Amino acid sequence: MAKINRRTLLQSGVALAGASMFGGIVRRSQAATAGLTLYNGQHRATTEALVAAFTKATGIDVTLRNAESPELAAQIAEEGDRSPADLFFSEQSPPIASLQEKGLLGQIDPATLKLIPAKFSAKDGTWLGATVRTRVVTYNKKMISPADMPKSIMEFGTTALAGKFGFVKQDGFQEQVMSIVHIKGRDAALGWLKGLRQYGRSYNGNRIASTAVENGEIAMALSNNYYWYSLAKEKGAENLNSALYSFPGDDAGNIFNVSAAGMLKSSRNQAAAQRFLAFMLSKEGQEAMIATTAEYPVLAGLTSPYNLPSLANFTAPVSPADMGSASDAYALEREAGLI
């Protein structure tokens, strides 16, 4: 996903304003008939497929602003009630939870929230999980056997695995830290982070880390499941040097990460925004998203085209709703010298 800074976002806002003069984008005062503005941090192809399906089904146009989820959350917080956004779709739950904590999100229709398990949505009903991915360990089958894999996330960052593992400080990492905080405590999480810094190898992206494992550059890496499944669909799982591993039991390393969406309290087109959120959890909306990425649907009864194993076989002791904005995770990373 292309990185867009605040200046780029502001410049795109100017461009949007100019487009409104020529009928390309209708002004905010006409939002009730003009459609929706969605700030999007989720994978662009996924959201574009969802929006296309929604517009086809409803006739409601949706204008996208694409950037990294934390940047968009900060932008919305800065804009406050003046934000042109009606909706925010975040690749992870912490950025949208930060808006929840600031009181900037509106209530989602309870009938919509009832469509999916409560563990995938905010406890106060202000955001919902749209797709799910799991935290896993990607390992090279030629460099380590499943029997020799660590039995707990806490073994990473110890001398026993020095130089053998990689990690990525984004896209699921903060949730990983918060899970350890919830299960093991703050001191244990800080010690774990210091161990990662001392004994692990940092990669600038989960895809890069997964590729490094596949190519034999390193034995294993903490990652999200969908990078490996995308590669497996492309090349065939039987042809890969790497495989996925999950920790046994209720280990703190087992996490559900969700892409999450919510409606801004300041939206002037809330009826259409509620309709969009409901569509996200419909069969049509879910199928549009999971066709583009190896993430799980949150709606029961659907099958991913990426041949994902059942989520029933994966146990996570901490729910996405319990992760919060992950501000504690960032503080711990700074204290450990990782950022």
Give the residues covered by each predicted segment:
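A bilobed periplasmic-binding-protein/Venus flytrap-type ligand-binding module shared by bacterial periplasmic
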Residues: 138-143, 181-182, 256-269, 288
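A ligand-binding cleft/hinge motif common to bilobed small-molecule-binding domains
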Residues: 94-98, 220-240
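Periplasmic-binding protein-like
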Residues: 133, 161-168, 193-196, 201-203, 238-265, 279-302
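N-terminal export signals
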Residues: 8-28
